[in-house]
């Protein structure tokens, strides 16, 4: 059996809970035959795999390195180390280009691109190595026609603008015409870069506000003419220019990609994406290896399936599909009982990593088509009924009744925990008094005080919380503890305001997922002291340090 989850923390918890469950079942089992089976399961626990998909792929590659074409002693490249290696490969490549291939830099300069601007493109290619890069040389486009048409339009449109600024200011179309006219008077539009910069500025959808024109017909005429200019000349010219630049950019970046791959090979390192791609290739191209691992892992369980990307999905189907020689994973039929996945499409938040609801829905469709069963879990064991009622009422109007390619369907929660009499439950709202001019700093201060005061009342026993049987077994009472509270902020820049409100009441707290510690007043004051020590000739920094809380000289 192999059980795969998304994070190392979740994998560690899964291992612990699985072993404890087996031990508890073994201790409580009276049937000799079942007890013997549980004993065997415990003794052979190491034969199961419980971990992340990347560690699972690493284990498969280490077991069949020859067929995979990898160094048997390869090491996994952690994300931080991988980022450092990418930066090293990029810096070394740029240095090599400056010394050995200055004409490549001249090509980039010709299209208005600095080498440093390409690092993000370089990283994107490395992140998706399975995506084929289009690399086709395109001649430099002739921009003379779009330049002439643009100048003609600006000359004509300018004459229809009001002589004075309208009372409510220029509308978006008027402002765009004025900006275009200024640009062509300051810069030489015979320079392709200056012309392209202007075309990019004009690639907008400005609307004319008729009451800001001397004649409403003029507003309509100019708006229609601008749309025609865009559709017939501006957009095609920009498209041709981008196609021309694309080949130059790709040609500039691919050698750096090769340099990075060589550095990895020299060190026998595989990053997370390599582990996935190498494993998918190993299983796709080797039916015998596929058969071997299918015998080894007869049952595959996958948690957090909504976080699975196309390559990971491919691996799952290769490991469970009956057709050993079929290379298209979509044509594979998982063996009955071999694949079990759990996922919540409403938690699909990794689209930037190609793990989105499209993959989830496609796998769901394929499994149903191949005879699999889809079970919807609606029972909520964590929340009390007051929370469930509120959630159902809010999200019924947010999610569609039927799932589509963009969004999961609404599924009402069936909460089983009852609200306890005398205990606080449900969703409440803090109401703030009206703040003059809606000054955000004052609103944040008041909100922080409200929340900290509410927490302090709970710690003092002014209200009680519902507890689960497990919480009571661990010694928790109805009286709230500091760990019962979580403050979620939309913006982290106000985090220090909330921490100060908690500190004022001696309420312990922990910051997660933010930079509040480095942005705190204490850290800013420490930085001022260090800056004064570093630059002792700067009187401004010295004064800032002396006025900090460490010296307190006003």
Regions found by a protein language model. Give the residues of each.
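Conserved motor-region signature of P-loop NTPase helicases/translocases
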Residues: 1-20, 80, 84, 88, ...
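Conserved ATP-dependent motor core of P-loop NTPases, especially the RecA-like helicase ATPase domain
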Residues: 22-190, 270, 339-340, 431
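Catalytic cores of nucleotide-enabled group-transfer and carboxylate-activating enzymes in metabolic
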Residues: 34, 286-287, 334, 362
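Core structural elements
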Residues: 45-59, 110-130, 249-255, 273-275, ...
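Conserved helicase/translocase P-loop NTPase motor core
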Residues: 51-57, 251-298, 312, 322-324, ...
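Short hinge/gating elements
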Residues: 69-75, 260-265, 374-377, 434-441
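Conserved ATP-driven helicase/translocase motor core recognized via long
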Residues: 116-270, 371-372, 469-473, 497, ...
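Walker B beta-strand of ABC/ABC-like P-loop ATPase nucleotide-binding domains
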Residues: 300-302
């Amino acid at each position: 059996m192999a059980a795969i989850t998304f994070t190392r923390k979740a994998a560690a918890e899964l291992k612990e809970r699985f072993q404890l469950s087996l031990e508890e079942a073994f201790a409580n089992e009276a049937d000799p035959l079942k007890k013997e089976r549980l004993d065997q399961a415990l003794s052979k626990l190491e034969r199961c795999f419980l971990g992340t998909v990347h560690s699972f792929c690493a284990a498969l590659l280490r077991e069949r390195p020859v067929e995979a074409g990898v160094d048997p002693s390869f090491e996994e490249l952690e994300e931080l180390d991988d980022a450092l290696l990418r930066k090293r490969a990029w810096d070394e490549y740029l240095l090599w280009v400056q010394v050995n291939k200055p004409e490549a830099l001249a090509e980039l300069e010709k299209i208005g691109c600095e080498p440093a601007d390409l690092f993000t493109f370089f990283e994107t290619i490395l992140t998706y190595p399975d995506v084929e890069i289009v690399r086709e040389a395109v001649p430099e486009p002739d921009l003379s026609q779009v330049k002439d048409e643009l100048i003609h339009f600006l000359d004509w449109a300018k004459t229809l603008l009001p002589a004075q600024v309208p009372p409510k200011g220029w509308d978006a179309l008027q402002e765009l015409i004025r900006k275009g006219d200024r640009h062509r008077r300051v810069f030489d539009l015979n320079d392709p870069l200056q012309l392209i910069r202007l075309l990019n500025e004009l690639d907008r959808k400005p609307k004319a506000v008729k009451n800001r024109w001397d004649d409403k017909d003029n507003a309509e005429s100019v708006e229609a003419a601008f749309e025609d200019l865009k559709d017939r000349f501006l957009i095609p010219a920009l498209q041709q220019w981008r196609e021309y630049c694309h080949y130059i950019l790709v040609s500039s970046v691919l050698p750096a990609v090769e340099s990075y791959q060589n550095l990895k090979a020299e060190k026998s390192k595989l990053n997370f994406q390599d582990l996935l791609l190498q494993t998918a290739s190993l299983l796709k191209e080797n039916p015998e290896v596929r058969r071997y691992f299918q015998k080894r892992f007869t049952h595959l369980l996958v948690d957090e399936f909504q976080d699975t990307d196309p390559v990971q999905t491919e691996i799952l189907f290769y490991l469970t599909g009956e057709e050993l020689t079929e290379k298209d994973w979509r044509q594979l039929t998982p063996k009955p009982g071999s694949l079990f996945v759990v996922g919540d499409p409403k938690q699909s938040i990794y689209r930037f990593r190609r793990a989105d609801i499209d993959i989830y829905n496609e796998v769901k469709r394929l499994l149903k088509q191949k005879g699999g069963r889809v079970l919807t879990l609606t029972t909520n064991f964590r929340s009390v009924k007051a929370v469930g009622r509120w959630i159902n009422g809010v999200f019924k109007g947010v999610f569609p009744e039927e799932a589509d390619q963009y969004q999961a369907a609404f599924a009402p929660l069936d909460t089983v925990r009852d609200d306890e009499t005398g205990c606080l439950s449900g969703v409440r709202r803090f109401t703030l008094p009206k703040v003059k001019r809606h000054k955000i700093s004052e609103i944040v201060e008041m909100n922080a005080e409200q929340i900290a005061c509410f927490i302090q009342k709970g710690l003092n026993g002014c209200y009680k919380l519902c507890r689960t049987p497990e919480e009571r077994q661990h010694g928790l009472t109805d009286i709230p503890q500091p760990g019962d509270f979580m403050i979620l902020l939309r913006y982290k820049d106000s985090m220090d305001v909330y921490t100060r409100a908690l500190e004022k009441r001696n309420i312990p707290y922990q910051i997660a997922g933010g930079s509040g510690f480095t942005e705190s007043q204490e850290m800013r004051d420490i930085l001022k002291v260090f800056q004064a020590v570093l630059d002792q000739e700067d009187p401004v920094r010295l004064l800032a340090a002396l006025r900090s809380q460490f010296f307190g000289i006003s």
